Amino acid sequence: MEISRESARRLMIEKQGITQFPESNNKKSVVDTINHLGCLQIDTISVIERAHYLTLWSRLGSYDKNYLDESAYKDKKLFEYWAHAACFVSYDHYRFYLHAMKVREEEMKVRFVKRTGKDVEVLDQVLARIKNEGPLCSKDFEGPKKNGGWWNRKTEKVAMDYMYGAGILMVSDRVSFQRYYDLSENVLPSWVDVEPPSYDERIEFFIRKTLKSLGAIKPIDVRKYYHHHSVKLGQTTKQIEERLKGLDGVSRFKVEGDKNTHYSLDEDIERLDTLEGDFSFNDVRLLIYFDNMMWNRERVQHLFGFESKLEIYLPQDQRVYGYYHLPVLYGDQLVARIEPKMDRKEKKLIIRGYWTEPGFNETEEYTEKLERNLSTFAAFHKADEIEWLG
């Protein structure tokens, strides 16, 4: 059996929850979206807004950004940990990350000394302060220590990061995006399942979550969706393929233009057939490169014919597009790139650049939908107007 790239990308768009904005949103819709996606990447760049808020916007439309913060730090429905990268994850999945925490705890002391050149007693000192004083952030480690000398803020931050990775500390809150760490026993809700899964159960969990999130996948997609280093997957691509072959409820097929075998849940096979000729989504969405759908550049290139170019790390003279440009999804195609920037002082969304993909011809319908989507986007960021430059 072989399916078209068109069907594969259409299934992914549906699986990613992009095709329909809900009529209304609440904290449950935020948590449910993250639960379905498996994880939501956190990033510090805020040219428009931080990445996690934008990925949710592409699926929920207008929503209260406080819903995400409250769900994580007040209601304790979500926790921060390494999944694809630094992510929000549902507490329903917590136990599947215990293995990664254990591995990091075993490596922690050696890696800390190697990275900082400091004695491991710094870890104990930082932990003691948090035990005595409650949640602390890196800024709290400035000024003289009681026994003389000075706190090295960078070293203490590294210590907290390592203990966070080891599951000893958790992020209890963020203030102005600054992470506050507390003892895990003070953060972890009592209802959370902390029974470690078996080795096989853990691997199957990450495979099935990738299938549910992406639709038609290759084995490498599992290692790239849940980054193999982040979750300490411990599986080669070949080993994942052997597991996929043995899973109940999973079908095999080829995708046009790729010699590798693809896999999908049986429940999605009939939908793949339907999607060959029927795909009702014909709207516009602005995506970011930190969006779950855009993580795997090779996958995006194959299914959409779109070359991902995250240019924030490039010098200006090496950029083809803009510093923080966004891919534009129209129906089942990535058709353009746009570079918005938020002027918060003037309450203005500034469009610094816009580029259509080769072969795409703008229509009146597309232009209207793009403008409508930008208006919704601007309102979400509390911009009173949109200004196009150039």
Regions picked out by a protein language model, each given a short descriptive name:
Residues 1-390:
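Long, charged, low-complexity, helical-prone intrinsically disordered regions
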